[in-house]
Protein backbone atom coordinates (compact mmCIF):
# COMPACT_ATOMS: atom_id res chain seq x y z
CA UNK A 1 0.00 0.00 0.00
CA UNK A 2 1.43 3.37 -0.97
CA UNK A 3 1.69 6.25 1.51
CA UNK A 4 -1.11 8.22 -0.15
CA UNK A 5 -3.50 5.28 0.19
CA UNK A 6 -2.56 4.84 3.84
CA UNK A 7 -3.13 8.54 4.49
CA UNK A 8 -6.56 8.34 2.85
CA UNK A 9 -7.57 5.40 5.06
CA UNK A 10 -6.36 7.13 8.21
CA UNK A 11 -8.22 10.33 7.35
CA UNK A 12 -11.36 8.35 6.51
CA UNK A 13 -11.19 6.46 9.81
CA UNK A 14 -10.73 9.73 11.72
CA UNK A 15 -13.69 11.33 9.96
CA UNK A 16 -15.84 8.29 10.70
CA UNK A 17 -14.87 8.35 14.35
CA UNK A 18 -15.80 12.06 14.61
CA UNK A 19 -19.14 11.64 12.84
CA UNK A 20 -22.23 10.80 14.88
CA UNK A 21 -24.17 8.05 13.13
CA UNK A 22 -27.92 7.74 13.53
CA UNK A 23 -29.37 4.23 13.29
CA UNK A 24 -33.04 3.39 13.48
CA UNK A 25 -33.94 -0.02 14.91
CA UNK A 26 -37.33 -1.50 14.03
CA UNK A 27 -38.18 -4.44 16.27
CA UNK A 28 -41.31 -6.17 15.00
CA UNK A 29 -42.50 -7.54 18.34
CA UNK A 30 -41.52 -7.61 21.98
CA UNK A 31 -40.32 -11.05 23.02
CA UNK A 32 -37.10 -12.59 24.28
CA UNK A 33 -35.42 -13.70 21.06
CA UNK A 34 -35.95 -10.36 19.31
CA UNK A 35 -34.90 -8.46 22.44
CA UNK A 36 -31.69 -10.49 22.48
CA UNK A 37 -31.09 -9.71 18.80
CA UNK A 38 -31.37 -6.00 19.54
CA UNK A 39 -28.99 -6.19 22.49
CA UNK A 40 -26.51 -8.25 20.48
CA UNK A 41 -26.67 -5.87 17.50
CA UNK A 42 -25.72 -2.92 19.68
CA UNK A 43 -22.95 -4.98 21.33
CA UNK A 44 -21.59 -6.12 17.96
CA UNK A 45 -21.34 -2.55 16.73
CA UNK A 46 -19.63 -1.50 19.96
CA UNK A 47 -17.04 -4.26 19.52
CA UNK A 48 -16.23 -2.66 16.17
CA UNK A 49 -15.88 0.86 17.60
CA UNK A 50 -19.40 2.16 17.01
CA UNK A 51 -20.47 2.90 20.57
CA UNK A 52 -23.84 4.18 21.73
CA UNK A 53 -23.50 7.62 23.30
CA UNK A 54 -20.09 8.21 21.73
CA UNK A 55 -20.41 8.06 17.96
CA UNK A 56 -23.77 6.32 17.48
CA UNK A 57 -27.32 7.30 18.38
CA UNK A 58 -30.00 4.59 18.24
CA UNK A 59 -33.74 5.13 17.88
CA UNK A 60 -35.48 1.91 18.89
CA UNK A 61 -39.11 1.46 17.88
CA UNK A 62 -41.35 -1.56 18.46
CA UNK A 63 -44.11 -2.36 15.97
CA UNK A 64 -46.08 -4.48 18.47
CA UNK A 65 -46.38 -7.31 15.93
CA UNK A 66 -48.32 -5.08 13.52
CA UNK A 67 -47.17 -4.97 9.88
CA UNK A 68 -48.90 -1.63 9.26
CA UNK A 69 -47.05 -0.05 12.18
CA UNK A 70 -43.78 -1.54 10.86
CA UNK A 71 -44.36 0.21 7.55
CA UNK A 72 -45.13 3.53 9.25
CA UNK A 73 -41.99 3.36 11.38
CA UNK A 74 -39.86 2.42 8.37
CA UNK A 75 -41.20 5.32 6.31
CA UNK A 76 -40.23 7.79 9.04
CA UNK A 77 -36.80 6.26 9.65
CA UNK A 78 -35.89 6.09 5.96
CA UNK A 79 -36.09 9.85 5.71
CA UNK A 80 -33.92 10.75 8.68
CA UNK A 81 -31.32 8.07 9.56
CA UNK A 82 -28.04 6.72 8.18
CA UNK A 83 -29.02 3.06 8.52
CA UNK A 84 -31.97 0.92 9.54
CA UNK A 85 -31.64 -2.30 11.50
CA UNK A 86 -34.77 -4.40 11.09
CA UNK A 87 -35.45 -7.22 13.53
CA UNK A 88 -37.71 -10.03 12.19
CA UNK A 89 -39.04 -10.67 8.71
CA UNK A 90 -42.04 -8.26 8.61
CA UNK A 91 -39.86 -5.41 9.88
CA UNK A 92 -37.14 -6.21 7.33
CA UNK A 93 -39.60 -6.25 4.44
CA UNK A 94 -41.07 -2.92 5.52
CA UNK A 95 -37.64 -1.35 5.99
CA UNK A 96 -36.39 -2.48 2.59
CA UNK A 97 -39.45 -1.07 0.83
CA UNK A 98 -39.13 2.26 2.64
CA UNK A 99 -35.36 2.65 2.35
CA UNK A 100 -35.01 1.63 -1.30
CA UNK A 101 -35.74 5.12 -2.64
CA UNK A 102 -33.96 6.88 0.22
CA UNK A 103 -30.73 5.06 -0.59
CA UNK A 104 -29.86 4.14 2.98
CA UNK A 105 -28.69 0.63 3.92
CA UNK A 106 -30.88 -1.88 5.73
CA UNK A 107 -29.33 -4.54 7.94
CA UNK A 108 -31.75 -7.22 9.07
CA UNK A 109 -31.63 -9.97 11.65
CA UNK A 110 -33.94 -12.81 12.73
CA UNK A 111 -35.23 -13.37 9.19
CA UNK A 112 -35.93 -17.08 8.81
CA UNK A 113 -35.83 -17.26 5.01
CA UNK A 114 -34.48 -14.15 3.25
CA UNK A 115 -35.11 -15.71 -0.17
CA UNK A 116 -38.83 -16.36 0.34
CA UNK A 117 -39.14 -12.87 1.87
CA UNK A 118 -37.53 -11.48 -1.32
CA UNK A 119 -34.71 -9.95 0.70
CA UNK A 120 -32.19 -12.12 -1.16
CA UNK A 121 -32.20 -13.97 -4.46
CA UNK A 122 -32.02 -17.73 -4.87
CA UNK A 123 -28.45 -17.18 -6.07
CA UNK A 124 -27.62 -15.51 -2.75
CA UNK A 125 -27.35 -12.03 -4.24
CA UNK A 126 -29.07 -9.15 -2.50
CA UNK A 127 -31.78 -7.21 -4.38
CA UNK A 128 -30.52 -3.82 -3.25
CA UNK A 129 -28.84 -1.96 -0.41
CA UNK A 130 -29.67 -4.66 2.13
CA UNK A 131 -28.04 -7.59 3.94
CA UNK A 132 -28.23 -9.29 7.30
CA UNK A 133 -28.53 -12.55 9.18
CA UNK A 134 -30.98 -15.43 9.08
CA UNK A 135 -32.29 -17.30 12.11
CA UNK A 136 -33.26 -20.37 10.10
CA UNK A 137 -34.31 -23.00 12.61
CA UNK A 138 -32.46 -26.32 12.94
CA UNK A 139 -35.65 -28.17 11.98
CA UNK A 140 -34.09 -31.61 11.59
CA UNK A 141 -32.37 -31.34 14.98
CA UNK A 142 -35.70 -30.34 16.55
CA UNK A 143 -37.47 -33.35 15.03
CA UNK A 144 -34.73 -35.63 16.34
CA UNK A 145 -35.15 -34.06 19.78
CA UNK A 146 -38.92 -34.59 19.82
CA UNK A 147 -38.48 -38.21 18.72
CA UNK A 148 -35.89 -38.79 21.47
CA UNK A 149 -38.10 -37.32 24.20
CA UNK A 150 -41.40 -38.71 22.90
CA UNK A 151 -40.65 -42.07 21.25
CA UNK A 152 -44.33 -42.98 20.84
CA UNK A 153 -45.51 -39.64 19.41
CA UNK A 154 -46.89 -39.54 15.87
CA UNK A 155 -48.44 -36.09 15.42
CA UNK A 156 -46.88 -32.68 16.01
CA UNK A 157 -48.97 -29.50 16.03
CA UNK A 158 -47.69 -26.19 14.69
CA UNK A 159 -49.36 -22.81 15.09
CA UNK A 160 -48.49 -20.09 12.60
CA UNK A 161 -49.57 -16.61 11.56
CA UNK A 162 -50.83 -16.69 7.99
CA UNK A 163 -49.33 -13.28 7.17
CA UNK A 164 -45.79 -14.15 8.32
CA UNK A 165 -43.67 -15.30 5.37
CA UNK A 166 -41.01 -16.59 7.74
CA UNK A 167 -43.48 -19.05 9.25
CA UNK A 168 -44.64 -20.32 5.85
CA UNK A 169 -41.11 -21.32 4.83
CA UNK A 170 -40.29 -23.10 8.10
CA UNK A 171 -43.65 -24.87 8.20
CA UNK A 172 -43.03 -26.22 4.70
CA UNK A 173 -39.65 -27.57 5.82
CA UNK A 174 -41.22 -29.27 8.85
CA UNK A 175 -43.80 -30.96 6.61
CA UNK A 176 -41.07 -32.10 4.24
CA UNK A 177 -38.80 -33.59 6.93
CA UNK A 178 -41.29 -34.87 9.52
CA UNK A 179 -42.10 -38.18 7.76
CA UNK A 180 -38.40 -39.11 7.95
CA UNK A 181 -38.85 -39.31 11.73
CA UNK A 182 -42.29 -40.93 11.77
CA UNK A 183 -44.24 -37.72 12.36
CA UNK A 184 -47.21 -36.04 10.75
CA UNK A 185 -47.45 -32.25 11.02
CA UNK A 186 -50.88 -30.79 11.74
CA UNK A 187 -50.90 -27.01 11.47
CA UNK A 188 -53.36 -24.32 12.39
CA UNK A 189 -53.18 -20.78 11.00
CA UNK A 190 -54.15 -17.63 12.87
CA UNK A 191 -54.48 -13.97 11.92
CA UNK A 192 -53.93 -12.34 15.33
CA UNK A 193 -53.10 -13.33 18.88
CA UNK A 194 -56.80 -13.20 19.72
CA UNK A 195 -57.30 -16.26 17.51
CA UNK A 196 -55.01 -18.45 19.61
CA UNK A 197 -57.42 -19.86 22.25
CA UNK A 198 -59.84 -21.14 19.63
CA UNK A 199 -57.02 -22.40 17.41
CA UNK A 200 -55.48 -24.29 20.32
CA UNK A 201 -58.82 -25.83 21.25
CA UNK A 202 -59.05 -27.18 17.71
CA UNK A 203 -55.42 -28.27 17.39
CA UNK A 204 -54.42 -29.79 20.72
CA UNK A 205 -56.86 -32.75 20.76
CA UNK A 206 -55.36 -33.91 17.45
CA UNK A 207 -51.67 -33.94 18.39
CA UNK A 208 -49.18 -35.41 20.87
CA UNK A 209 -47.27 -32.15 21.31
CA UNK A 210 -46.68 -28.81 19.60
CA UNK A 211 -43.49 -27.14 18.44
CA UNK A 212 -43.06 -23.41 17.95
CA UNK A 213 -41.69 -21.66 14.91
CA UNK A 214 -40.06 -18.24 15.10
CA UNK A 215 -43.57 -16.89 14.56
CA UNK A 216 -43.71 -13.46 16.16
CA UNK A 217 -47.41 -13.47 17.03
CA UNK A 218 -47.38 -16.97 18.52
CA UNK A 219 -44.22 -16.30 20.53
CA UNK A 220 -45.60 -12.97 21.78
CA UNK A 221 -48.60 -14.89 23.17
CA UNK A 222 -46.56 -17.81 24.51
CA UNK A 223 -48.26 -17.61 27.91
CA UNK A 224 -51.59 -18.39 26.24
CA UNK A 225 -50.07 -21.31 24.34
CA UNK A 226 -48.51 -22.76 27.49
CA UNK A 227 -51.66 -22.39 29.59
CA UNK A 228 -53.90 -24.06 27.01
CA UNK A 229 -51.36 -26.82 26.37
CA UNK A 230 -51.18 -27.58 30.08
CA UNK A 231 -54.97 -27.95 30.17
CA UNK A 232 -54.76 -30.58 27.43
CA UNK A 233 -51.62 -32.24 28.82
CA UNK A 234 -49.62 -31.59 25.65
CA UNK A 235 -45.97 -30.45 25.93
CA UNK A 236 -44.74 -27.46 23.95
CA UNK A 237 -41.30 -27.50 22.34
CA UNK A 238 -39.76 -24.05 21.90
CA UNK A 239 -37.71 -22.58 19.09
CA UNK A 240 -35.13 -20.79 21.28
CA UNK A 241 -33.88 -20.45 24.85
CA UNK A 242 -36.24 -17.71 26.06
CA UNK A 243 -39.27 -19.88 25.29
CA UNK A 244 -37.74 -22.75 27.26
CA UNK A 245 -37.03 -20.44 30.17
CA UNK A 246 -40.68 -19.38 30.08
CA UNK A 247 -42.08 -22.92 30.19
CA UNK A 248 -41.49 -24.88 26.99
CA UNK A 249 -40.02 -28.32 27.67
CA UNK A 250 -36.96 -28.13 25.39
CA UNK A 251 -35.55 -26.68 22.19
CA UNK A 252 -32.81 -27.11 19.66
CA UNK A 253 -32.17 -23.45 19.00
CA UNK A 254 -29.67 -20.82 18.05
CA UNK A 255 -28.28 -18.16 20.38
CA UNK A 256 -30.00 -14.90 19.45
CA UNK A 257 -27.66 -12.52 21.24
CA UNK A 258 -24.79 -13.93 19.19
CA UNK A 259 -26.91 -13.63 16.04
CA UNK A 260 -27.38 -9.96 16.90
CA UNK A 261 -23.64 -9.49 17.46
CA UNK A 262 -22.94 -11.07 14.09
CA UNK A 263 -25.41 -8.63 12.54
CA UNK A 264 -23.74 -5.71 14.31
CA UNK A 265 -20.37 -6.70 12.89
CA UNK A 266 -21.91 -6.78 9.40
CA UNK A 267 -23.39 -3.31 9.99
CA UNK A 268 -19.94 -2.03 10.96
CA UNK A 269 -18.58 -3.18 7.59
CA UNK A 270 -21.26 -1.14 5.84
CA UNK A 271 -20.60 1.91 8.00
CA UNK A 272 -16.94 1.67 7.04
CA UNK A 273 -17.81 1.89 3.37
CA UNK A 274 -18.72 -1.56 2.06
CA UNK A 275 -21.95 -1.84 0.12
CA UNK A 276 -24.65 -3.87 1.86
CA UNK A 277 -25.65 -5.19 -1.55
CA UNK A 278 -22.24 -6.84 -1.93
CA UNK A 279 -22.31 -8.65 1.45
CA UNK A 280 -24.17 -12.01 1.31
CA UNK A 281 -26.57 -12.70 4.14
CA UNK A 282 -25.20 -14.96 6.88
CA UNK A 283 -26.53 -17.67 9.18
CA UNK A 284 -25.45 -19.29 12.44
CA UNK A 285 -24.84 -23.00 12.01
CA UNK A 286 -24.51 -24.04 15.66
CA UNK A 287 -27.60 -25.12 17.60
CA UNK A 288 -27.87 -25.66 21.33
CA UNK A 289 -30.08 -28.04 23.29
CA UNK A 290 -31.97 -26.14 25.98
CA UNK A 291 -34.11 -27.99 28.53
CA UNK A 292 -36.48 -26.93 31.28
CA UNK A 293 -36.35 -29.66 33.98
CA UNK A 294 -39.57 -28.52 35.69
CA UNK A 295 -41.55 -28.51 32.44
CA UNK A 296 -40.12 -31.89 31.43
CA UNK A 297 -41.08 -33.38 34.79
CA UNK A 298 -44.60 -31.96 34.54
CA UNK A 299 -45.15 -33.98 31.36
CA UNK A 300 -43.24 -37.06 32.51
CA UNK A 301 -40.47 -36.56 29.95
CA UNK A 302 -36.80 -37.39 30.46
CA UNK A 303 -33.74 -36.48 28.44
CA UNK A 304 -32.02 -39.62 27.09
CA UNK A 305 -28.44 -40.26 28.16
CA UNK A 306 -27.11 -39.65 24.66
CA UNK A 307 -28.44 -36.07 24.80
CA UNK A 308 -27.85 -35.22 28.45
CA UNK A 309 -24.19 -34.28 28.00
CA UNK A 310 -25.03 -31.38 25.70
CA UNK A 311 -28.30 -30.37 27.36
CA UNK A 312 -28.25 -26.88 28.86
CA UNK A 313 -30.45 -26.52 31.95
CA UNK A 314 -32.13 -23.12 31.62
CA UNK A 315 -32.80 -23.05 35.37
CA UNK A 316 -29.04 -22.87 35.89
CA UNK A 317 -28.49 -20.09 33.37
Question: What do the predicted segments below correspond to?
Answer:
Residues 17-317:
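Short hydrophobic alpha-helices and adjacent helix-cap/hinge residues
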Residues 12-13:
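N-terminal signal peptide c-region/cleavage motif recognized by signal peptidases
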Residues 1-3:
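Short, small-residue-biased leader/transition segments that mark boundaries at the very start
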Residues 6-7, 16-17:
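Gram-positive cell-envelope targeting signals
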Amino acid sequence: MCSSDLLFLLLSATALADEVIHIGIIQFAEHGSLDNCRVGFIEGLAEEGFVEGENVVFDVQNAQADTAISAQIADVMAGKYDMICAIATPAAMAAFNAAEDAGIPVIYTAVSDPVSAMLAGADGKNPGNITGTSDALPVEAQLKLIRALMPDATKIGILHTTSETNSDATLALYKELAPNYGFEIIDKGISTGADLPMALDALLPQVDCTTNLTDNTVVSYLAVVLEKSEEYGKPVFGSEIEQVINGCVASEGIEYTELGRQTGRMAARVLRGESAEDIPYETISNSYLYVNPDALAAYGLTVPAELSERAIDVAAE
